[in-house]
Amino acid sequence: MKPNIEIHHIPGIERLEDVEFVKVMTEHTSPEKVHNVNWAEYSYAPDVAVNLAFSDNVLALMYTVKEEHILGTVLEDNGPVWEDSCVETFIKDPFSDNYYNFEVNCIATKLAAHRRSRTDCDLFPTEKLNEIRCFSSLPHEKTNTINTDQKEWLVALMIPFRLLGLESAPDFLDVNFYKCGDNCRQPHYLSWSPIGLPEPNFHCPEFFGRINLIKK
């Protein structure tokens, strides 16, 4: 069954300092598990959750991850971040059958695009990418934690509604949240909303769930 949840308004959350943002999101939102293993041959399942909120201007997300191998090699935006320890936010275009994907590796390197399909997209230029606030608990440098005690990381993302073509917060968004790591020691492909396809593929809006933005 597709998830259908409510998320709540936190005025001005995008203006908080990083530490305060994490505190507010932890204390005032509930974690949504990104835990669906849709393909048996990729059975490894890190512990992944996303906390969600919104302001008048942005959708705010905080991913927390615990995994055996943390890999961060991509330093340039719009590079192949999905090969690293990566979380992904896919949002259906409110005005068409297209969708947006916002992908971030564990060291806060971003990829964003407006997509018609898995292979047909318009990548966000630098000026648009710079509108997306993003930070990580890890430094922005290459990391590979095989055989170390480092197992956990956090990344936050604030996506302005204007990048979705919206003037203000909508009543709802159709979305999916993912965790992947193509080049990790144990490749994996987890989703928030289940995916009923025979092979790993996140580019499937027909399986998106829904978040309802409660403006009380």
What residue ranges belong to the model's regions?
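Structural preference for beta-rich elements and adjacent junctions enriched in aromatics
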Residues: 1-216
